[in-house]
Amino acid sequence: MISSIRQKLAEIGKNTCESQVLVAQEKSKGVKLTPSSNGKALKIKVDDCLIKDTQRCDCLYFYQQSKSKRHAFLVELKGNNYTHALDQLESTKNHPNYVGIVTVAKPIKEWAVAIVSEKAKTNRPKKEEWEDANKVRLRVIPLKDDEIFDLSELTKPI
């Protein structure tokens, strides 16, 4: 999965968008991906790199836990503006660059993750309505300032 994503990035002239660091921080909140010992992960900078021509989310993570367990995470780090975060996630999901990459990656689970302030009002639109409209799972993660959420938590069995 990771090598096919890198090939696609090179094909569309976006290979410089790959980040060597699996952590992203903005507005005093953060996200990271800690792969398992045999897992492989890749972070792509979306904002002003993979996508420049429209609203977009901050970054994109791909995580291959095993041959059959492949995950994609669209991530937007936001303060209180929950609805704008969802607009950015939706716009990114529908952008041709993202569609091309996710097509070659073939994740078994695709997540949209909005990291927001713990004080953000997240009742509209409702999570289920957004998921139905966008055909992707949505996780809204309210964080305190200076907290970092590990995306690998979403891959663990409940």
Regions found by a protein language model. Give the residues of each.
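Alpha-helix termini
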Residues: 64-67, 97-105
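Domain-level recognition of nuclease-like catalytic cores that cleave nucleotide substrates
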Residues: 2-3, 7, 108-158
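A structure-centric signal for secondary-structure junctions around beta-strands
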Residues: 56, 69-71, 109
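Short, charged, amphipathic alpha-helix that recurs within catalytic cores of restriction-modification
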Residues: 85-102, 110-112
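Active-site metal-binding core of divalent-cation-utilizing nuclease and nuclease-like domains
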Residues: 25-66
